[in-house]
């Protein structure tokens, strides 16, 4: 059955490696629908704004509700989660009784020119998501190191065939995970 997958890129940079990886997901699988969920225009989280929620936040939350699952594709900054992504997750967690990510299936992918493939950031993101009662794809980690050697930076496309295969396998596992989430609730 066709699934609707939301893609959240944890980088604001227009041509970020992670945005290129996210775009490649849409090209590697045409049997599912992919929807970009942008976090660029979200204001900094502030509980005072919950009285009159900004339209950008309302649209962001609605986009999350409208998909079957979310894949977060994020870089790692200073061995941690990018601030813009943490801000988006904070908005998605509030108010707690109607948190849009609660019980939603989420997968994590990260790409970096370094050698550890966003391992530290993914640990932190996973910790935040688990505190939000999100169903994070267990066991499967998609850590893409040396990403600058795996893409064509002029064409803005993933060229490494092994990484493409890994992404296809990861996506297959994620879709399978979505199908089994109801059994967990």
Give short role names for the model-derived ranges:
Residues 2-31:
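N-terminal beta1-alpha1 ligand-phosphate binding loop
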Residues 14-17, 45, 80-81, 117-118:
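Secondary-structure boundary/capping motif
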Residues 18, 22, 57, 85, ...:
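A general structural signal for well-ordered alpha-helical segments in protein cores
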Residues 30-35, 134-135:
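A generic structural motif
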Residues 39-56:
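N-terminal beta-loop-helix "entrance" segment that forms/cooperates
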Residues 54-133:
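Helix-loop-strand module that forms the ligand-binding subsite of alpha/beta enzymes
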Residues 135-185:
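Glycine-rich phosphate/pyrophosphate-binding loop and the adjoining helix
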